[in-house]
Amino acid sequence: RILRAFLDPARRLFATPQRAVDSLWCMEEALRSGVVPVVVADLNDYPALTPVRRLHLAAETGAKYSAKAPPLGVLLTPDKGGAAGVETRWLLQPDSTEEQPGWQLKRLKARRAPPRAWHIAQTPDYCFTAMT
């Protein structure tokens, strides 16, 4: 219900490969196409540096074909992350009270920005706002 405000179900495509290498291939092809603004892969382990580099190159190619912003690739990995070669590393954890649902969003690593944390809270109209 919360995500309906942001994600139209008719505009999503799910691929469910069995192997991580196939998930990364799907992600690479989607990024390279330039027609998909965001690609998310949920992995059980950290990818090696070579596949991450391939994703970077695919996103650069996709940016040439995109009429809007360059495509964004998001790798969901266990724990606090640890994939080599990523541009940024984030951590999202629940941080709710009975009165207000929320999350703690932390930028753990970024090449051009220091670590930082935000408290993200849900507003009555199901939007989210950074509280800190």
Which role does the model predict for each range below?
Residues 1-132:
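N-terminal regions of ATP-driven nucleic-acid and macromolecular assemblies
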